[in-house]
Each structure stands twice: as structure tokens, then as C-alpha cells.
């Protein structure tokens, strides 16, 4: 029976995301699970345009940008030790982790 655990990580801050990915890779290597990734997924870029003035001057606008960085890690036939270590993993605020079997 071939099982694979897909771990998808999302964050607005790529440094936090990369640190979390390194932690998961270290856990996988120390417990002996086979790992594919981290695979960088496309970055979602959202741009918001807001008027600077509350009344007139529609030509004066300000733009803000929000980027969502994503990574995918695939563990093939994860060991029970790996699953326990991932359950205990403390993820920093700002990083969203999704597990799929």
C-alpha cells in the first residue's frame, strides 16, 4: 500500500515559510521518511488600488500589493515517528499548513 502525505504551506512572508519548510525536511530526514520537495508553487499576487483623497483628486491613487507564497512537500510512506513529530510541530503565526493523505 503506497501512501503519500501532502503538506501544503502558505504564507505572506517567504522567510517564515522557508524556515518552516526546513524544519519539516529535518524532521523527515531524522525519522527516515522519503521526501519529495519542497516544490515552490506559483505566488499569488493581489493588487489593491485606493484613492488617496477622501473627496476629489481621483487621479491620485495608491496601490498596495499582497503576495501569497506557497510550497508543497510530499512524504512517501510516512513513518509513524514522522507523523507524531509533525503533530507536535509548532508552526509560527503567519504560516498556514494543510495536510492531505
Swiss-Prot record:
GO molecular function: structural constituent of ribosome; tRNA binding
Function: Involved in the binding of tRNA to the ribosomes.
Protein name: Small ribosomal subunit protein uS10
Listed InterPro entries: Ribosomal_uS10, Ribosomal_uS10_dom, Ribosomal_uS10_dom_sf
Domain of life where this protein originates: Bacteria
GO biological process: translation
SUPFAM superfamilies: Ribosomal protein S10
Gene3D superfamilies according to UniProt: Ribosomal protein S10 domain
UniProt cross-references to SMART domains, sorted A to Z: Ribosomal_S10
UniProtKB keywords: Ribonucleoprotein, Ribosomal protein
UniProt similarity note: Belongs to the universal ribosomal protein uS10 family.
Quaternary structure annotation from Swiss-Prot or TrEMBL: Part of the 30S ribosomal subunit.
Pfam families in the record: Ribosomal_S10
UniProt cross-references to HAMAP family, sorted A to Z: Ribosomal_uS10 (MF_00508)
GO cellular component entries: ribonucleoprotein complex; ribosome
